[in-house]
């Protein structure tokens, strides 16, 4: 873990950390609880220059059969914000700490070894929206999945319903 983002470029001598887990429970940062005060000077949308940053690296091996389908990288929870690279290519950025984030990495993976790198930032401009009576715990704190799904799969289905004035008849519309 690093105090500043620019310090996090070299990877020699890295420690291992379990995923899912949080830095503070692994001794990489202080436990911090807030109820009404922000844990840093309030100056939206800016965050402190000293913004603890953690880098995660994982190598996965994919076979030719895997490559016949689409590949999605899903994070079930990362706090606070994060960048993702696959084989050196930036594939996305996320900053919704309490919800899953998915990245279609089909065009970035290959048969054989694939390097996945994630840079997690303790603070982001989204931190201003998330501050509440809570412990601040940073890192990849929920599961991560590499999903192999059929090409052109339906990933999102929307159904809307309305009722007529009698509340007896309805009309449903669906979309993907």
Residue ranges of predicted features:
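N-terminal glycine-rich cofactor-binding segment
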Residues: 36-45
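Beta-propeller folds
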Residues: 7, 17, 61, 65, ...
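Alpha-helix boundary/capping detector
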Residues: 40-41, 142, 170
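Hydrophobic alpha-helical membrane-insertion signals
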Residues: 3-23
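Intrinsically disordered, low-complexity regulatory regions of eukaryotic regulatory proteins
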Residues: 10-16, 27, 33, 154
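Surface beta-strand/loop "capping" patches
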Residues: 151-176
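Short, low-complexity, polar/charged sequence segments that are solvent-exposed and flexible
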Residues: 10-12, 33-36, 92, 135-139, ...
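Accessory beta-strand-rich segments of carbohydrate-active enzymes
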Residues: 3, 22, 26, 30, ...
């Amino acid at each position: 873990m690093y105090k500043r983002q620019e310090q996090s470029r070299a990877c020699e001598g890295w420690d291992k950390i379990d995923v899912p887990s949080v830095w503070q429970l692994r001794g990489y940062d202080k436990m911090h609880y807030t109820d009404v005060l922000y844990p840093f000077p309030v100056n939206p949308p800016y965050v402190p220059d000293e913004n603890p940053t953690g880098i995660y690296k994982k190598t996965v091996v994919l076979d030719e059969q895997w490559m016949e389908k689409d590949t999605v990288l899903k994070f079930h929870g990362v706090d606070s914000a994060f960048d993702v690279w696959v084989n050196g290519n930036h594939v996305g950025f996320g900053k919704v700490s309490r919800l899953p984030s998915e990245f279609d990495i089909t065009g970035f993976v290959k048969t054989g070894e694939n390097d996945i790198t994630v840079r997690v930032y303790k603070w982001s401009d989204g931190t201003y929206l998330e501050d509440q009576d809570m412990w601040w715990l940073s890192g990849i704190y929920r599961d991560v999945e590499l999903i192999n799904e059929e090409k052109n799969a339906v990933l999102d289905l929307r159904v809307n319903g309305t009722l007529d004035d009698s509340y007896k008849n309805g009309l449903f519309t669906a979309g993907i």
